[in-house]
Amino acid sequence: MHILKLFFFFVVVLTSLNVLAESRLQKILETGKIRVGTTGDWNPMTMKDPSTNEYKGFEIEIVEQLAEDMGVNLVIIPTEWKTLVNGIVSNKYDISTSASLSAKRALSTGYTDSYFKLATVPLTLKNNLSKFQSWEDINKEGVKVAVTLGTTQEQQAKQIFPKATLNIIESPARDFQEVLAGRADAHITSNI
């Protein structure tokens, strides 16, 4: 009985997401524009040039090509990591760049197939390398770990490092800056 309930739950969720996706696509085609949320702070994927206020990067090239292929105009909407996925749910924009897949996020938004795989990595100063030879070395009382608010790395750090002190950093500040300033021993990021 429990499996049957779960099956129906997933059918309803997936059907609802499919209907929403179809209506969103219809709206994009009717309005002639696709709104894309991006942070503009993840080099080389999405970067905002402060001198021109234009966005560049690998993911920007992808959404430019998508808009061209669809025959619609591209509208870039600045966002932050903490609201990246919520912007889709709240209809602030139609799609986003750089949103890592997680089970929680998949309950409210649809995802395409990944075009590359990320790994989560810890980064620290060279003089700390002998202290941090493994993930377990980071998961200790007294160790300070910086992560960016709203990222999958934030969620991972909460699970992997329950004994460490987490410094959750809100953009536009960067978690690696906490390490450079001596306010954190390591930061958790992707391998990009």
Q: What are these language model-derived features?
A:
Residues E22-A99, L107:
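Extracytoplasmic small-molecule ligand-binding "clamshell" domains
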Residues T46-T52, V63-V72, S134-N139, Q153-E170:
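Ligand-binding cleft/hinge of the Venus flytrap
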Residues P50, K104-L118:
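Ligand-binding "clamshell"
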Residues L66, I88-V89, I138, E178-L180:
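Hydrophobic residues within well-ordered alpha-helices
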Residues N73-E80, V147-T148, A164-P172:
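Short beta-strand-to-loop elements that line the ligand-binding cleft
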Residues T83-N86, A99-S108, Q155-Q159, F176-I192:
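A ligand-binding cleft/hinge motif common to bilobed small-molecule-binding domains
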Residues K126-V143:
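Flexible hinge/capping segments at coil-to-helix
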